[in-house]
Amino acid sequence: MKLQVLVLVLLMSWFGVLSWVQAEFFTSIGHMTDLIYAEKDLVQSLKEYILVEEAKLAKIKSWASKMEALTSRSAADPEGYLAHPVNAYKLVKRLNTDWPALGDLVLQDASAGFVANLSVQRQFFPTDEDESGAARALMRLQDTYKLDPDTISRGELPGTKYQAMLSVDDCFGLGRSAYNEGDYYHTVLWMEQVLKQLDAGEEATVTKSLVLDYLSYAVFQLGDLHRAVELTRRLLSLDPSHERAGGNLRYFERLLEEERGKSLSNQTDAGLATQENLYERPTDYLPERDVYESLCRGEGVKLTPRRQKKLFCRYHHGNRVPQLLIAPFKEEDEWDSPHIVRYYDVMSDEEIERIKEIAKPKLARATVRDPKTGVLTVASYRVSKSSWLEEDDDPVVARVNRRMQHITGLTVKTAELLQVANYGMGGQYEPHFDFSRSDDEDAFKRLGTGNRVATFLNYMSDVEAGGATVFPDLGAAIWPKKGTAVFWYNLLRSGEGDYRTRHAACPVLVGCKWVSNKWFHERGQEFLRPCGTTEVD
């Protein structure tokens, strides 16, 4: 009964917490924290179940010990034992009453409460999509920050607070996720890591023959026919009855025979070409991939000494706003052209926590606008959850909005709502423009406020590693610092887009990244930021 009450309490409390959470937990660390508490309560429920089972087992053990002692005496001299009428009565009673009662005790199912709890909460657990998304996130971090599988498996990441290692089965899960998505490059890397840990003697449920089955086909898909044959033969030495491996080996060997039939020169050239490109990370659609990722690693930043001399710090009072004359903000130049500045102590810790508190229940997978259709959709290159806050939601929202207006000298009347974003595992937003380009579907037409003239980005958390805001065309990288904000203009004074402001949010390697954005629009800024005398002013 006690267990049933506990289960009911657990169900009521966590049903309320998780019922509003959508799938795609991996896209928001904020939502994943709820899973920690859900798992903690499941452990408590499981411990209660174990206590009940142990108490039941203790009774059964006590009964068994007592019966063993009794039957050893009675079986030694059955007639003499039964000569005593009390013994005869007790034997009948035991077999008619006590043993059936013991049977009922054994048949009692103490797991019902725990199973009921697990079944209800399971509706809100991560899905296969979450697991594959989390696997992709780890591989994204692996590629962006040039981490080898062994480093990730040992959990040797910069800025980590807790030790975390990947088991053999964990590594196999990563390799299998890559395989299921046709990503044979990462399949090979992680299946090789599985073999390495198996050879080191680690325990696992996965078998070496299963790993070789995946690995041999993956290297074949990457064009390494000789190694595919070698691995398949190794698989068959472990499991001679493996039908698919036998068929694959015959197929691979036939392809090798066909290769040998080619001219020696062609074969040599082809072999060299294959080896040169073997196991290379596949190319994708993003032209500035190398530049973007090197900036994320802190490499390739083009902040030369000459440029650095142009950067200064100062106290900023806006356009002599009375509030800022009394308490100006510290302003630091991050880049000279286009001018990107950072402001310090823009939001207090209390304001940040309050905004996160009211934003969290509204978080939903962040979307992007399809440039062809103008329709909002989710995309693999933007991994985060976001919500939009109105001033009516809480006084702190109105207060922060006014502060951004004072700092920038721009009106927030035509600005978008305050967007709060929380990045998940490997959370990122690949290179993009904040403004709508002339060849795009007019993304802001329905707002009637013109294009996005400026971006005000608040950092609401520190990030232990990764998570920089980078500008690939500039070679600039800006690192998150809690309570600070960066600001830049997306449009030139002529109203044309400043294409140098193409930027990205790097994947979060370690930590939890919270930001909030305010996008100012053109309407209402005509006299606050008037046109210049030239097109590029």
From Swiss-Prot:
Predominant cellular place of this UniProt entry's protein: endoplasmic reticulum
Binding site for Fe cation: 432, 434, 503
Gene Ontology, cellular component aspect: endoplasmic reticulum lumen; procollagen-proline 4-dioxygenase complex
Tissue: Expressed at least in brain, heart and lung.
Enzyme class: oxidoreductase
EC numbers, comma separated: 1.14.11.2
Function: Catalyzes the post-translational formation of 4-hydroxyproline in -Xaa-Pro-Gly- sequences in collagens and other proteins.
Protein name (Swiss-Prot/TrEMBL): Prolyl 4-hydroxylase subunit alpha-2
Organism: Mus musculus
Gene for this chain: P4ha2
